[in-house]
């Protein structure tokens, strides 16, 4: 019996005898890479690979863009910038202020600096919210990092 007659008929899933296979099923059942050669000639395999590559590249680019948008740091924190434009967390807090009450937006200056304020660490910073350095909880022990 030849290869083509072996795969010409196959038992159906319902169990009611044999029925002819479709051309797509025949190509799935073929061995020794014949299906791969057919797809290479047709170009469907290449298109499929390019499609998934494009999907992954776009997904990665969007995720990285979102990461960098939320990780914006500024060296100066002077409240309103040129034309009232803000970046990073300042812009996000302003939007949140609009959403909360619908009234006036949150216009407080918010500093995104990652550098710790030395005066705040010592006990008091005279600049308050207008300070260009970060205020918050900082780990003073560098032994944990090693």
Curated annotation (Swiss-Prot):
Which SMART domains did the record assign? ZnF_C3H1
Keywords carried by this UniProt record: DNA-binding, Metal-binding, Zinc, Zinc-finger
Give me the segments passing through the membrane: none
Region Disordered: which residues?
80-106
Q: Do you know which PROSITE patterns this protein is assigned to?
A: ZF_C3H1 (PS50103)
Q: Which residues form a coiled coil?
A: none
UniProt KW Cell cycle keyword = no
| The keyword Aminoacyl-tRNA synthetase is assigned to this record | no
User: GO molecular-function annotation terms?
Assistant: DNA binding; zinc ion binding
Classification via InterPro entries: Znf_CCCH (IPR000571)
User: Where is the signal peptide, in residue numbers?
Assistant: none
Q: Which Pfam families match?
A: zf-CCCH
Q: Where are the zinc fingers (C3H1-type)?
A: 111-138
Protein name (record): Putative zinc finger CCCH domain-containing protein 29
